[in-house]
């Protein structure tokens, strides 16, 4: 059988796999017409008079802030779970650590520290040892000729935890440590010459897992936020829960802003028609946020679960909303989202850990979620389909290259997506039930963020 025939067969199997278990994305009208179940109808009464849920002061204990509101977190140290997952039961002996970075990742095996923030350096960039985040920050600042202002006394601390706090002081430290502006310009000129000699389809060829890993390292939390999620006068959230729910909406808006910048920089995505870009982001932002939450939450699966005999028999108790910030299960139960909380951890986080999913596979799946040719209203569905098929092939090749002995791994990874879609639809029911989504403005917010050439997103390694 020829290589072409093999490729066609693999593509067909992927399509069948997704279409069999993955329902279509609902239109905005369908989402607004969602009728809450009996469970949701009783939700307001249950929250007004809690009887069995733990007594938690939500305004104080709703969020567990570990190391600063915007402080970054390194990728979780993944551990293989060799025990059979029986519900939430996980009483196996902790397995050996799993390597965070694939062999070809820029941070694999680094022995130097970033001269600017002290994080692990990925090499010498523009004259000094630096991490991917500071490298990207300096490059974007020079290329876009950005100017910053310091809100303090121009002597802010720039380290791994606080490098997002002040762009002015971070840029000044880059210069003081020896980063050269001219090196960025020379790099751009070399890239332009390579582009002129490239094949016309180079934009699709550039879509690779390696490129996605670079983008993941450059995306940081937003200094500002969109207003897609909000608690307004028309919201059906009881008064005692409005403050914590508003905090959750604020977190979601910051993550959506960062997501838009990430999507815009994916090779060839920015060349799609702007209306198609908006539809793709609008159709996937909720799934992408939940997927990122599940990925970050792997690190906390065993926290606060031990009984007296030190056996992990209770469900996972913590979910990581964003780097440095967790939500406790008790608070989720009181807010009426306990089912979604448990499903994210049981159907996504635990399965990710069991599969020993690494960051390369994570970013590939994120791109596959975004590049959904079945989104209604696309003008260039074929272009999106080509990009998604490219990501299928990249992920399949990566699985065979890095996990050659694990047959069926590619399919096992894709089978997490139907569960993600199901959880996403359930969470949408809650968002629309309490009028937390500014539906009429979602498209305009996304359009403004996509068209903004100087996004309010600092570039920093996650």
Swiss-Prot record:
Region Hinge, annotated ranges: 180-201
Query: Main subcellular localization, coarse class?
Result: nucleus
Q: Name one cellular component (GO) term.
A: nucleus
Q: Which intervals of the chain are annotated as region Modulating?
A: 1-113
Question: Where in or outside the cell?
Answer: Nucleus
Keyword set for this entry? Answer: DNA-binding, Metal-binding, Nucleus, Receptor, Transcription, Transcription regulation, Zinc, Zinc-finger
Q: Sorted alphabetically, which SMART domains does this protein's record hold?
A: HOLI, ZnF_C4
Residue ranges constituting the NR LBD domain according to the UniProt record: 204-453
What is the tissue localization of expression for this protein? Abundant expression seen in males and ovaries.
**UniProt DNA-binding region:** 114-179
Q: Note the superkingdom of the native organism.
A: Eukaryota
Under Gene Ontology molecular function, one entry of this record is: nuclear steroid receptor activity
Gene3D superfamilies assigned to the protein according to its UniProt record, in alphabetical order: Erythroid Transcription Factor GATA-1, subunit A, Retinoid X Receptor
NR C4-type ZnF: 114-134, 150-174
What does the subunit comment say?
Answer: Heterodimer of USP and ECR.
User: Domains: what does the record tell us?
Assistant: Composed of three domains: a modulating N-terminal domain, a DNA-binding domain and a C-terminal ligand-binding domain.
Q: Which family does it belong to?
A: Belongs to the nuclear hormone receptor family. NR2 subfamily.
Name of the protein in its database record = Protein ultraspiracle homolog
Q: Give the species.
A: Bombyx mori
Organism placement in taxonomy: Eukaryota, Metazoa, Ecdysozoa, Arthropoda, Hexapoda
The gene is USP
